[in-house]
């Protein structure tokens, strides 16, 4: 059984990690241990590089806390141009997989507040009245009328980031 350290305690992210690992390695093939670690970037990262740096930092910090694991996984959400997205970073001590998620264009009324220094999650909670929306369906669920959720979009990115770990051509 793979010991997987999730560098987050966010339920939407943990669900995506678990589903993706079980899709690739088989149901019941992994045990997820969530840990809260620092990203080393602002609460609301801007741009692809800052967001990816946050995910990489979280993986490194999780690895230092739990060096005995088989995999360390981080999902860092950010804002790039007029959209929200995330970076997924997965490390197994030998190689790393990284993938960027799909992007969701955000309306100006939301972006204006985020650009003024507020984080997307709290802005969306105020807009929708849903407490801790970032730990649930997120802006993605709201603006896709529930057709997608944070977790479903993250799931795809985790699957992509896992590609180097089960395809020999990457080695």
Curated annotation (Swiss-Prot):
One of its GO terms (biological process) is nucleotide metabolic process. Coiled coil: none annotated. InterPro entries: ITPase-like_fam (IPR029001), Non_canon_purine_NTPase (IPR002786), NTPase/PRRC1 (IPR026533), YjjX_NTPase (IPR050299). Substrate binds at residues 8-13. Keywords: Hydrolase, Magnesium, Manganese, Metal-binding, Nucleotide metabolism, Nucleotide-binding. Its cofactor is Mg(2+); Mn(2+). The keyword Nucleotide-binding applies. Signal peptide: none annotated. It holds the Pfam family NTPase_I-T. It catalyses: XTP + H2O = XDP + phosphate + H(+); ITP + H2O = IDP + phosphate + H(+). Its EC number is 3.6.1.73. It comes from the Bacteria. GO terms for molecular function: ITPase activity; metal ion binding; nucleotide binding; ribonucleoside triphosphate phosphatase activity. Mg(2+) binds at residues 38, 68. It is an enzyme of class 3 (hydrolase). Binds 1 divalent metal cation per subunit; can use either Mg(2+) or Mn(2+). Phosphatase that hydrolyzes non-canonical purine nucleotides such as XTP and ITP to their respective diphosphate derivatives. Probably excludes non-canonical purines from DNA/RNA precursor pool, thus preventing their incorporation into DNA/RNA and avoiding chromosomal lesions. Homodimer. Belongs to the YjjX NTPase family. This is Inosine/xanthosine triphosphatase. It comes from Salmonella paratyphi A (strain AKU_12601).
């Amino acid at each position: 059984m793979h010991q997987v350290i999730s560098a987050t305690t966010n339920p939407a992210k943990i669900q995506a990690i678990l589903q993706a690992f079980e899709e690739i390695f088989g149901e019941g093939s992994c045990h997820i241990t969530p840990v809260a670690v620092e990203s080393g970037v602002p609460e609301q990262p801007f741009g692809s590089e800052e967001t990816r740096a946050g995910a990489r930092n979280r993986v490194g910090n999780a690895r230092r806390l739990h060096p005995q694991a088989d995999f360390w996984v981080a999902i860092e959400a950010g804002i790039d141009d007029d959209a929200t997205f995330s970076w997924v970073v997965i490390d197994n001590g030998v190689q790393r997989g990284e993938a960027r998620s799909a992007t969701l264009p955000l309306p100006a009324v939301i972006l204006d507040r985020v650009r003024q220094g507020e984080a997307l999650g709290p802005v969306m909670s105020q807009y929708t009245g849903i407490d801790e929306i970032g730990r649930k369906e997120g802006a993605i669920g709201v603006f896709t009328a529930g057709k997608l959720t944070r977790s479903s979009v993250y799931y795809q990115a985790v699957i992509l980031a896992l590609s180097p770990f089960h395809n020999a051509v990457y080695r």
